[in-house]
Amino acid sequence: MRHRKSGRQLNRNSSHRQAMFRNMAGSLVRHEIIKTTLPKAKELRRVVEPLITLAKTDSVANRRLAFARTRDNEIVAKLFNELGPRFASRAGGYTRILKCGFRAGDNAPMAYIELVDRSASEAEAAAE
């Protein structure tokens, strides 16, 4: 029985899941919007939201924690230099999930996951 076991398995073993969400979190921080399946988007929230909360208070210890979770210095720099200050006044809820139909090959439900306070120029670039 899987009572009280949180998180989705997504038909992957734990190391594959960890690597996938590490890559997806990096892509979301870098591009501020990504398209993925709905279950992956919902699970990605649980990875990205704590990273942004961590980035709101800039310290060496927090930067090292963020690096341990992302393994990418470019992502850590963007988290602490751009996203942390941008979301300083927001108490959680940094991401938005928008459903966008079904994938052509296997009819999987697809969704965009984006950071809520994206600038208008980035939104226009993503739409193109």
From Swiss-Prot:
GO terms for cellular component: cytosolic large ribosomal subunit. Keywords: Ribonucleoprotein, Ribosomal protein. It holds the Pfam family Ribosomal_L17. It comes from the Bacteria. Signal peptide: none annotated. The keyword Hydrolase does not apply. GO terms for biological process: translation. GO terms for molecular function: structural constituent of ribosome. SUPFAM superfamilies: Prokaryotic ribosomal protein L17. Gene3D superfamilies: Ribosomal protein L17 (3.90.1030.10). PROSITE patterns: RIBOSOMAL_L17. NCBIfam families: L17 (TIGR00059). Belongs to the bacterial ribosomal protein bL17 family. Part of the 50S ribosomal subunit. Contacts protein L32. This is Large ribosomal subunit protein bL17. It comes from Edwardsiella ictaluri (strain 93-146). The lineage of its organism: Bacteria, Pseudomonadati, Pseudomonadota, Gammaproteobacteria, Enterobacterales. The gene is rplQ.
